[in-house]
């Protein structure tokens, strides 16, 4: 009989999506993506997730969240249905990172997890998380040295549509040419090539300020779309935050037992 593997349930909660990871303790073995819906109840989320994977295999839960109302629902699912106390990334959790910002407590859980995921790499790293907001996290010697936050693609589209009379809502696609020839392709160019140019430009400015070379990793929901448009050399890892969350869980698991 094939042995059933125990799994760690990982949640990366963003303002637009909830990325769910299942881990064997070493690797991310499966991922799922749900919409972030603050009006949905814990029971509704549980029913939705129960259709995706077998809850009986879950032995631990870890949550990285920037949406407090969703955090509470996931805690309720963990405690009510799984009878497990989840690990929440936040104050008091051992991350292994130094955070050299004016107020380290205001650095989001997603940024912490992304930084932890690359902390062991020898070179300085710039993580670009293309989510609801675009975050640039500069890490060196297991230390976050600085962060940049800009509006994400969806926020930019909503701002255009919501603050103009004639611009329509659009699907996020890369147009065939940079110079658009109709309203939709013009807007699509702005939010795709525009973000790629922002990434390239900030890479150059960070290099000028730090006066050192560094590696760049793109992650987040739109990284697959934007990465090919960037001119600088970079890599892409869509599971970076989940990998960092898994490392934080393993780092704290022995302390919780």
Please state what every model-predicted region is.
Residues 110-113, 165, 228, 235-257:
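Glycine-rich phosphate-binding/hydrolytic loop that grips phosphoryl groups
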Residues 73-79, 136-146, 229:
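Short Gly/Thr/Asp-enriched flexible loops that form oxyanion-binding sites at enzyme active sites
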Residues 17, 64-71, 212-229:
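Glycine-rich phosphate-binding loops at beta-strand->alpha-helix junctions
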Residues 2-29, 118, 123-142, 160, ...:
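Gly/Thr-rich phosphate-binding beta-strand-loop-beta motif of the actin/hexokinase/Hsp70
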Residues 84-88, 93-164, 193-202, 234, ...:
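Phosphate-binding/catalytic loop of phosphoryl-transfer enzymes
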Residues 32-36, 175-215, 222, 233-235:
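Adenine-nucleotide phosphate-binding core of ATP-dependent small-molecule kinases
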Residues 40, 44, 69, 106-113, ...:
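Conserved active-site and cofactor/substrate-binding residues in soluble primary-metabolism enzymes
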Residues 1-9, 13-95:
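N-terminal glycine/serine-rich phosphate-binding loop of ATP-dependent small-molecule kinases
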